Amino acid sequence: KAADRIYGEGLGVSWSITEKSCIDAINELCYHIEAGIRVNRQTGLYEIVLFRDNWFEENEIHTISESKIKSMQYEITNADEVINQVNVNFYDRANIKNSSFSISESGLIQTLGRVNAETLDFPYFMNMRNAEIVANWKLKLLSTGV
């Protein structure tokens, strides 16, 4: 399901793995495609889970009863610490050079009265389109306090 979704989104990743552990390579891939990994208890195999707003159909969403939750911690984000801009670095294959651009949350910049930026590196994206898609997802997460 994850591979089909990534293909449909056109999120091509180009990279050569050398001298990395398998888990390190998987974690780097997950960073680029906004995903996580879990181990399937029945098979013992790793599974990639994409973090998307509409990843599950409504009938696939499971509810967890509060009695099943042993502990939960919320970390309240201070409004002054919310990220409202990301500076993105990627490799531009068409121009054969490293490139960068910025994406910002204008409303938050106005609210805070300043830019609070974080840098995202996507060395395995070879075009701005893919880096921009994932950077927007990451900015959405970073700019939303819990």
Where would I find each of the regions flagged by the language model?
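C-terminal extracytoplasmic interaction modules
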Residues: 1-146
